[in-house]
Amino acid sequence: MSWIIFYTIIAALLILDLGIIHKKNKVISFKGSILLSLFYFIISCLFGIYVYHNMGLDHAREYYTCFLIEKAMALDNIFIISIIFQFFNIPSTYQHRVLFFGIIGVIIFKAIIIYGGIMLIHKFSWLLYILAVILIATGIKTFNVSHKTYDIQNSYIYKSIIKNLNITHDLEGQKFVIKRNNKLYFSTLFVSLILIETIDLVFAIDSIAAIFAITNDVYIIYTSNIFAILGLRSLFFCLSEIVERFSYIKYSLALILIFIGFKIFIHHYIEIPAYISLTVTISSLLFGIIASILEKI
């Protein structure tokens, strides 16, 4: 029943998004983007209350912790999506269509990765320690890297697409596939979608690795991930412009990843409660936000 409720909510949100809010392909305003993201955030928080009533306080804490971690880790993802759109000169009126179908892909791929990951961890528990090393290494690396970049032209996926598919840079509305002279061509909207899906998969490995350390409950992991991504994609049209202003968020994320990594290593000796994980996550993110704001004053 819980899965039916979740998928019903997601289906309703997607229908609302594509069928009503973006039906006329108008560029959403900055204010509209903020309000829409706030709406998604409220829905996500209300779902957390549903988790609390049906699964208990600890599961609710795990849900909110996973939700916040996924939100934070997806910020770089949003920045790279912006780079992809700029590289292909995708008009703002068509960007939402790419993001929408990207969400559909995320819903499918995240399910596969999460279910597969849980099965592997249940069978090979030592894999958690490998994930812990990856998380700590990623956290340390995040402290040392000034900015993430994405070289589209030299990426393997881009080169493979250009080599194996007929690509046209002339758009015909929102079409991903265009037929000309009895020949099929793929538009840059399609290429953008494939690159974005690839980036989503790469980022999913880090984020899900972090979340596996919080809980191994498939329902909590999957629902928190999907709600977090839905909210961020709706905020894309303003977030892509302001994400760089919050320069200290990456340090918050680094602290969270290192904390989670060490949590895995010591869990046989010290069991860290869900409320501590949630407190560390919220405190770290607040530190990053406040420090970023103070730097601009």
Swiss-Prot record:
Transmembrane segment boundaries: 1-21, 32-52, 72-92, 98-118, 120-140, 194-214, 218-238, 253-273, 274-294
Compartments (UniProt record): Cell membrane
Membrane topology annotation: Multi-pass membrane protein
InterPro entries: Integral_membrane_TerC, Integral_membrane_TerC_rswitch
Assigned keywords, A-Z: Cell membrane, Membrane, Transmembrane, Transmembrane helix
Principal location class: membrane
GO annotation, cellular component aspect: plasma membrane
Cross-referenced NCBIfam families: R_switched_Alx (TIGR03718)
Similarity annotation: Belongs to the TerC family.
PANTHER family (UniProt xref): MEMBRANE BOUND PREDICTED REDOX MODULATOR (PTHR30238), THYLAKOID MEMBRANE PROTEIN TERC, CHLOROPLASTIC (PTHR30238:SF0)
Official protein name in the record: Uncharacterized membrane protein RP786
